[in-house]
Design a protein with these regions (language model features):
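Conserved long alpha-helical elements within nucleotide-processing catalytic cores of c-di-GMP signaling
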Residues: 1, 8-38, 44-48, 52-53, ...
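A structural signal for short, well-ordered beta-strand segments
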Residues: 2, 51, 89-93
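Core hydrophobic beta-sheet residues of small sensory/regulatory alpha/beta domains
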Residues: 2-4, 127
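ATP/adenylate-binding site constellation spanning eukaryotic-like Ser/Thr protein kinases
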Residues: 7, 48, 90, 122
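Residue-level recognition of strand-loop junctions within catalytic nucleotide-signaling folds
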Residues: 15, 54-58, 75, 96-97
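Cyclic nucleotide signaling catalytic output domains
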Residues: 43, 69, 73, 83, ...
């Protein structure tokens, strides 16, 4: 399984409290992720406010439990510079071999599923399925058609 995580409203924290506070929050989130996953799972800071987790879980129900555990742990308020910060994360998951035969495919599909979580609102997870890809292609085609209309 690949999980793709994106902190919700991280830019607001960076912009209002400064990049040092944002960096502290990233470190706290990393510790919370370590506390949430199983031994042997691999966590990486993907960049910015994104993380990935590589897990040997390949069962949908176990994936849901892992995502729920992460959401619960991240949601616990933290103190940075004497200010209480409520944090949440959007998660997308893809499962080997159903969703991809290699890590690139799994990351791409987990990222798409994470985007769906973002559109649902913060603090949620989505397990990838083929309907996500179909909906994204429909949206892309609609945007292309709208641009054609605007430009004509």
């Amino acid at each position: 399984t690949v999980l793709f995580l994106d902190l919700d409203e991280f830019k607001i924290i960076n912009d209002t409290m400064g990049h040092n506070a944002g960096d502290k929050l990233l470190k706290i989130v990393a510790k919370k992720l370590i506390a949430s996953v199983r031994e042997g799972d691999t966590i990486s800071h993907w960049g910015g406010d994104e993380f990935t987790i590589l897990s040997k879980i390949n069962d949908i129900d176990d994936n849901k439990k892992l995502c729920q555990r992460i959401l619960k742990e991240i949601k616990k308020a933290v103190q940075i510079n004497n200010k209480k910060i409520d944090c949440s994360v959007s998660i997308g998951a893809s499962i080997y071999p159903t969703d991809g035969e290699n890590i690139d495919e799994l990351i791409q599909k987990a990222d798409m599923a994470m985007y769906v979580s973002k559109t649902k609102g913060k603090d949620s997870f989505t397990i990838y399925d083929d309907k996500i890809n179909e909906k994204m292609l429909e949206k892309l085609n609609l945007e292309v058609e709208m641009r054609k209309i605007q430009n004509s």
